């Protein structure tokens, strides 16, 4: 059955317009970009097959546009639209931080780190430097490779914070394995940074660990006083 033969309130586009995007399943949202679907399949079925073969959703959407364009059921036009929509969503998410507004929602900072680091297939340790009103000054990737307590140099974080005249710092790093649970090394790094930054009266506000799903905040765990 073609999707146009479905009841109107079950078609993805009509459902989105009537009830909002949040009520659509992953397959229904993807079907809007798929368009007509493969021959003999409706768009939702094609989208489900894409998620089954190339998912989960994050793995599918982290692919560059050229890789998406090669997947059956997408093609160049749909892949470009999908990549453009993702980039617009990322820019919307990051806009408050990047235009210098005060940060009042810690979860938005975690999402910022997630968008910047999640897709990397190697570990990256980054810092967000803030002024005394907790407005973003700069975001920098400081260390890459295998991140452990021996690889993170607090002096470099302090040096960059002083260079930016920062009053506070939020740090974060990704776990390419997808497991965001903080390790003992992550906790050790956090304590070393707290001590080093404290010597120059700069606050460490949080340390986020990025993996699949929601970023883990060490401050929420009580490990950043």
Swiss-Prot record:
GO terms for biological process: proteolysis. The keyword Zinc applies. GO terms for molecular function: metal ion binding; metallopeptidase activity. The keyword Cytoplasm does not apply. A motif (JAMM motif) lies at residues 173-186. Disulfide bonds: none annotated. Residues 102-224 form the MPN domain. InterPro entries: MPN, RadC_JAB, RuvA_2-like, UPF0758, UPF0758_CS, UPF0758_N. Keywords: Hydrolase, Metal-binding, Metalloprotease, Protease, Zinc. It comes from the Bacteria. Zn(2+) binds at residues 173, 175, 186. Belongs to the UPF0758 family. PANTHER family: DNA REPAIR PROTEIN RADC, UPF0758 PROTEIN YEES-RELATED. This is UPF0758 protein XCC3860. It comes from Xanthomonas campestris pv. campestris (strain ATCC 33913 / DSM 3586 / NCPPB 528 / LMG 568 / P 25).
């Amino acid at each position: 059955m073609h999707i146009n033969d479905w009841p109107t309130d079950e078609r993805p586009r009509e459902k989105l317009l009537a009830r909002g995007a949040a009520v659509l399943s992953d397959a229904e949202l993807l079907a809007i970009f798929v368009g007509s679907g493969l021959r003999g399949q409706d768009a939702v079925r094609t989208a489900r097959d894409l998620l089954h073969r190339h998912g989960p959703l994050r793995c599918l959407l982290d692919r560059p546009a050229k890789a998406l364009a090669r997947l059956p059921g997408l093609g160049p036009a749909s892949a470009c639209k999908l990549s453009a929509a993702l980039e617009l969503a990322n820019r919307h998410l990051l806009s408050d931080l990047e235009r210098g507004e005060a940060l009042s929602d810690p979860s938005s900072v975690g999402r910022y780190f997630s968008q910047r680091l999640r897709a990397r297939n190697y570990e990256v340790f980054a810092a967000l430097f803030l002024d005394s009103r907790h407005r973003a000054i700069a975001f920098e990737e400081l260390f890459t490779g295998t991140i452990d307590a021996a690889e993170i140099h607090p002096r470099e974080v302090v040096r960059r914070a002083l260079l930016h005249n920062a009053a506070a710092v939020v740090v974060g790093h990704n776990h390419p394995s997808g497991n965001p649970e903080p390790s003992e090394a992550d906790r050790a790094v956090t304590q070393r940074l707290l001590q080093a930054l404290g010597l120059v009266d700069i606050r460490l506000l949080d340390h986020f660990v990025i993996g699949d799903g929601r970023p883990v905040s060490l401050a929420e765990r009580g490990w950043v006083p």
